[in-house]
Amino acid sequence: MGKILKSKSSWPRTVVRKWLNLRSGAYEFHSDYPVKGMEPRRKSCSDMIVPENFQGWLGQGNGDLKHSTGEQHVTRVDDKLDLKMFVGTWNVGGKSPHEGLDLKDWLKSPADADIYVLGFQEIVPLNAGNVLGAEDNGPAAKWLSLIREALNNTNNLSPNELEHTKSSQQPRFSFSGLSDDTPIPCNSTPPRGYSLAASKQMVGIFLCVWVRDDLRKRITNLKVSCVGRGIMGYLGNKGSVSISMSLHETSLCFVCTHLTSGEKEGDELRRNLDVTEIFKRTRFSRSSKDSRPETIMDHDKVIWLGDLNYRLRASSDLHEQLRNHDWESLLEKDQLKIEQRAGRIFKGWEEGKIYFAPTYKYRINSDNYVVQTEKSKEKRRTPAWCDRILWKGDGMKQLWYVRGESKFSDHRPVQSLFSVHIDLKNQSNRKTKPVNQNHRPNPVLTYTCHGKVQAEEILLLTRAQSCIDTLPRLISSAS
């Protein structure tokens, strides 16, 4: 009886420790790029999986990249550079990828991209163990491996590049086989292709940025920021992972989000509040004299991607329009577009024209949507465009906005291709852009939604108690 009481009283401390652990590791990220001036960091759950001397894990440093000696300075011949940027988002429904999963359908593009920005939601199941316990980065490692293989497929290389790749390849390492003192070799001259600039995970949200190798030395100021908007408004089952970086003299920010779910009336207000809080709480560390971007809106160009979870406003003709594939009429009921037109969120942001079918909710391994019937016990799910890509900033043009057809999860992936103008010369007269005023929270909205969210999340925690009781590692860590 004493053990049961102890277990039931331990979950608040477990939640607090989880929150503190997220905060202590908030500025760590994974990268192929070595960084100098790395600041010492407090140990977190990642240290139990990857040894401290693993050169891929980066603490938040001064953002300056270490280049190997002998690299020649590239002459700048123009003020601007035109690049292609591929952006993809995919809610994978808590499923870990199987070996050999083909990502070609998702990563295909009408033109080769210089930068790939890939965001995931639910890379792990959003159960009590993953939300409150140590982070499971096994699925993230698998996704990175598959992406690396797809982007650097030797079938797409020229004979010279192929020979260089063969001579430069290093043996693969398994995280599960690492001990605390296992040395991991770092190849100082990677083959031509794509390298991981940065990746960051927060529970089920995972964001990674890949850059063409010949642009690698022009990437600086890599930083990350996480905002939890899940349980109690701070845990990471919902929220955002953001990556900030500079390419030449242009600052870029990528925000991968998984917003509050639900299609009851008023749930869109909770999603609006998530967006407001993400703008408010996303911060990239910098010194007091540093002019580098600190907030999302300080950047020159911003991409916002993810499962935004906005649904279709209920109406009598909704299902008829779905049957007729009348996407134009259905999009008039899209909550994201309604809220944006009203100026409540994403004022001044752009999204491409949607010509594809709703991306959620599908039956697994099927082309059929989940539709509730009288005998069905499933939650009511009206198909919707939950998965979106938006952008803000001058010098960006969307060339392509489509969905993939992978049946891996209950969401269809979405992808886009952008043409991006990059400044090659320092714009010394450029001033920091203020955060848009429309993202300040409405006091009444904040108070109403906060009370509703708190009540529902306390109920969720209570129901999750039976799950927590079965997790010895959580109980022992909290005792």
From Swiss-Prot:
SUPFAM superfamilies: DNase I-like. InterPro entries: Endo/exonu/phosph_ase_sf (IPR036691), IP5P_plant (IPR045849), IPPc (IPR000300). Its EC number is 3.1.3.-. Gene3D superfamilies: Endonuclease/exonuclease/phosphatase (3.60.10.10). Keywords: Hydrolase. One of its GO terms (biological process) is phosphatidylinositol dephosphorylation. It holds the Pfam family Exo_endo_phos2. Coiled coil: none annotated. Residues 300-315 are annotated as: Catalytic 1. Belongs to the inositol polyphosphate 5-phosphatase family. This is Type I inositol polyphosphate 5-phosphatase 8. It comes from Arabidopsis thaliana. The lineage of its organism: Eukaryota, Viridiplantae, Streptophyta, Embryophyta, Tracheophyta.
